[in-house]
Amino acid sequence: MTFGIEFVPSDPVLKIAHYAKLAEQQGFDNVWITDHYNNRDVYSTLTVLAMNTNSIKLGTGVTNPYTRNAAITASSIGSLNEISGGRAILGLGPGEQATFDAMGISWEQPLTTTKESIAAIRGFLAGEKVTMDGDMIKFGGAKMAFKAGDVPIYMGAQGPKMLELAGEVSDGVLINASHPKDFEVAVKQIAAGAKKAGRDPKEVDVAAYACFSIDKDAAKAKSAAQIVVAFIVAGSPDMVLERHGIDPAAKADIGGAIAKGDFGALMGGMVTDSMMDAFSICGTPDDCKARINELLDIGVTQIVAGSPIGPNKEKAIKLIGKEIIG
């Protein structure tokens, strides 16, 4: 098993660099930085992290094939790989409708766009002249002018078709989930894609990109994660909620509270214990270890501690290092 950690660049970059250095010291393998237009730039942030760390791998968690041309993405991640001494990982997924609507970008054929973009990016990183006349991605003989080196490509994937594609074409899969029930389904879909491509499914790193909250006081850990879980519930398909025995009608109630900014209602019981169990790794070190072991038994090979990490981020990083990574 490897252990990753996610940071959102809504915080100042040097603050994130401090956390990344601490995570490296505590034995984390990977740091993942989210990519969203209203936060600090993902590649600028990762470059600062590269210059403030020595061994931890540095990934986009995740970027998308719409806001940047595939050649630009290849150049950016290749530059990061050079600066970091070969520590870059490209995490790329289809993104989501609401973000692109806000940006005025047409979100068309996400499965095809993701697949063709990965093929083009692999070509650029390999130093090839890329000529492509795909359904969505087209190049007329573009080529990078420097050697990028080997960069693993991970896919952010949720739905069955994306998970199968990840098994076909990616080195790893970042899945926003925390519960064994979700991975029982996902691991099978990834394996089906790998077998379709003639690959061993074990070649694909399966990462639980989880809402994570750890503290010696379980109640404090739970409280820190409730708002994050509320957003997860509000954005979950009915099928996923039903898998966990959660009434889909609760999604509308929680979504309404979020829209009103009524976080008191969310913290006051609207986010139930069953929701916390379904959509987070949360509690004391022993609580978190128990869930992690369940995920490893199903086929998860990387745990990513995503937001909020804990009620106190610095203490949580140290606690994970001491009590879980060991």
UniProtKB/Swiss-Prot annotation:
It is an enzyme of class 1 (oxidoreductase). It catalyses: 5-methyl-5,6,7,8-tetrahydromethanopterin + oxidized coenzyme F420-(gamma-L-Glu)(n) + H(+) = 5,10-methylenetetrahydromethanopterin + reduced coenzyme F420-(gamma-L-Glu)(n). Coiled coil: none annotated. Keywords: Cytoplasm, Methanogenesis, One-carbon metabolism, Oxidoreductase. Its EC number is 1.5.98.2. Pathway: One-carbon metabolism; methanogenesis from CO(2); methyl-coenzyme M from 5,10-methylene-5,6,7,8-tetrahydromethanopterin: step 1/2. Pfam families: Bac_luciferase. Catalyzes the reversible reduction of methylene-H(4)MPT to methyl-H(4)MPT. Belongs to the mer family. This is 5,10-methylenetetrahydromethanopterin reductase. The gene is mer.
